[in-house]
Amino acid sequence: MSHLDNGFRSLTLQRFPATDDVNPLQAWEAADEYLLQQLDDTEIRGPVLILNDAFGALSCALAEHKPYSIGDSYISELATRENLRLNGIDESSVKFLDSTADYPQQPGVVLIKVPKTLALLEQQLRALRKVVTSDTRIIAGAKARDIHTSTLELFEKVLGPTTTTLAWKKARLINCTFNEPQLADAPQTVSWKLEGTDWTIHNHANVFSRTGLDIGARFFMQHLPENLEGEIVDLGCGNGVIGLTLLDKNPQAKVVFVDESPMAVASSRLNVETNMPEALDRCEFMINNALSGVEPFRFNAVLCNPPFHQQHALTDNVAWEMFHHARRCLKINGELYIVANRHLDYFHKLKKIFGNCTTIATNNKFVVLKAVKLGRRR
């Protein structure tokens, strides 16, 4: 846990999933402080929109203004709810919207934590363009190293005149005034042909590797299991290419597509609808934090290409949680398959959790591993 003192309220905040005491990661950053310093309670008029509030620092601080928290991360929503409870703030004070929803009209203040991908930022700025006015105060913040010329040009192109502040605690702010510049329409998704198939893969703005098949998934697809039955999971499904391939290779199985990103789940659904519509009745689509709340002993197999970062921070906490959830939800003799960068040494992590691990394939960059749930080992 970490403490954030600001002009609105003193907060105790924690990350979600929680980090361990040996390698603690803070649930807020200097950019959050810097953004809050720009606001005065008496100056806030109209709806407050907060975009990409990773762990709820801004939403908790401004809770009395009934802000809208907008983003593409269910984990961020869970983190914000947990931090609201931790600080004794009514959860209903914050309204949650995903990035594809319609934003509230004529906001008084818009606070943006600059996301990792320009594609998501552009999608969000285009959505804001439909609702902001010249009187809306628009401020974005990030680590100074994460604000580039391309970031500023995007604000200018979509919204209007843009300036930056001096760096403070290695954070920088962007101030933008809306003046409705001329702007061509843009497609909601980026599409490309998947080599070796007749499939066209559609990707919403925040999908990992949205402009082409990432090399980890390419390697994984060469070693996926075949002729499985029952329910199998594409965990952290992204655009759903792994799940699509599983549907093709396992015609007797049902595939559950799971991701914490609403845009990823929407992309997976779209890709099944457009490429294998006849398989829709063998699919389930789930926005979730890994397999939280899913009953134990349900699945025959779980397949996963786990992330090793959360927002801008490198961490294996998300992967560790995925592995534990997979073990809980697998049937006895159910199998977990993962692909990962070799340097992450997930072999020993899986062996610790499952009591076994087998290397299925390896190259100079990636490894495909399999672990089997052998019993009720804790």
From Swiss-Prot:
It holds the Pfam family MTS. Its EC number is 2.1.1.174. GO terms for cellular component: cytoplasm. The keyword Transport does not apply. The keyword Cytoplasm applies. GO terms for biological process: rRNA base methylation. Keywords: Cytoplasm, Methyltransferase, rRNA processing, S-adenosyl-L-methionine, Transferase. CDD domains: AdoMet_MTases (cd02440). Its main location: cytoplasm. It catalyses: guanosine(1835) in 23S rRNA + S-adenosyl-L-methionine = N(2)-methylguanosine(1835) in 23S rRNA + S-adenosyl-L-homocysteine + H(+). GO terms for molecular function: 23S rRNA (guanine(1835)-N(2))-methyltransferase activity; nucleic acid binding; rRNA (guanine-N2-)-methyltransferase activity. It is found in: Cytoplasm. InterPro entries: DNA_methylase_N6_adenine_CS, rRNA_m2G-MeTrfase_RlmG, RsmC/RlmG, SAM-dependent_MTases_sf, Small_mtfrase_dom. Signal peptide: none annotated. It comes from the Bacteria. It is an enzyme of class 2 (transferase). Specifically methylates the guanine in position 1835 (m2G1835) of 23S rRNA. Belongs to the methyltransferase superfamily. RlmG family. This is Ribosomal RNA large subunit methyltransferase G. It comes from Escherichia coli (strain K12).
